[in-house]
Design a protein with these regions (language model features):
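Structural recognition of the conserved hydrophobic beta-strand(s) that form the central parallel beta-sheet
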Residues: 17-18, 43-49, 70, 79
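Conserved Walker B
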Residues: 20-24
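Amphipathic alpha-helical "lid/sensor" segments that cap RecA-like P-loop NTPase cores
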Residues: 96-143
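Short glycine-rich substrate-engagement loop in P-loop NTPases that contacts/grips substrate
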Residues: 1-15
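Accessory nucleic acid-recognition modules appended to NTPase machines
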Residues: 125, 129-219
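Conserved small helical "lid"/interfacial subdomain of P-loop NTPases
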Residues: 73-94
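Short regulatory helix/loop adjacent to the ATP-binding pocket of P-loop NTPases
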Residues: 33, 52-68, 80-85
């Protein structure tokens, strides 16, 4: 329907949510045009788990019409696992002379390890057992390496190589690991020759589906 009568999909009560809009990139310009006609804020919410595979069907940047918001998994405070007694924002505030760090953390080391592995996936929080909650991360990892890393731009990629790259990224978390570093890390277990360009291709695909996000300098 997006290819035949996209305006029909924009009708209805607002704000109107269009999920996974990147599957039909024509929504971008259609929404931009509709926003100009209505001349009102908060008309549409476009959500997606990846960037569009191609921008050939997008002809306008959307400047002045769209506001960007990046969603991540929940923090421990959002999931209810942290008391939130210590504020990171206040710790790094310019004027913090009157802020005293105090609080009691009920989380022991074993439970902290569990929370780290579980992550902040909303679906994981609804599970009745820890094992079921942990399984969500494994299922996401499997879906990313089997399907999403190739589907994002239509390039057929090896799922096992995708797994090794993600594991290498995990081992190098918090460091400035180059493609060469990743390549050297996985070379010992890779039977076929892999180039840096191939590594870059996988990394680019993983960034497009928001699996990898480079940390910016905090200062």
């Amino acid at each position: 329907m997006a290819n035949t009568n996209i305006k029909l999909l924009l009708r209805g009560e607002t704000p109107r949510l269009i999920d996974e809009w990147q599957i039909a990139p024509k929504f971008w310009d259609a929404v931009r045009n509709e926003v100009d006609k209505r001349d009102d804020d908060g008309q549409f919410i476009l959500t997606g788990s990846a960037v569009p595979p191609s921008y050939d069907e997008i002809f306008h940047t959307g400047t002045g019409r769209f506001a960007w918001l990046k969603l991540r998994t929940m923090s421990l405070w959002e999931s209810g696992d942290s008391t939130g007694e210590v504020s990171l924002a206040k710790l790094f505030a310019a004027d913090r002379t009157d802020y005293f760090v105090e609080g009691i953390n009920p989380i022991d080391l074993e439970h902290l390890a569990y929370l780290t592995c579980r992550g902040g996936w909303p679906k994981a929080l609804d599970k009745k057992s820890k094992q079921a909650a942990l399984q969500q991360a494994f299922e996401y990892f499997e879906a990313v390496t089997r399907f999403d890393v190739s589907r994002v731009d239509g390039v057929n990629r090896d799922s096992e190589l995708a797994r090794r790259i993600m594991r290498s990224y995990a081992r190098n978390q918090g460091s400035q690991a180059t493609a060469g570093t990743i390549l050297a890390d996985i070379a010992n277990n890779e039977s076929t020759e892999v180039s840096e360009n191939t590594i870059y291709s996988y990394i680019k695909a993983l960034k497009k589906i928001f699996v990898i996000e480079d940390s910016t300098a905090w200062n």
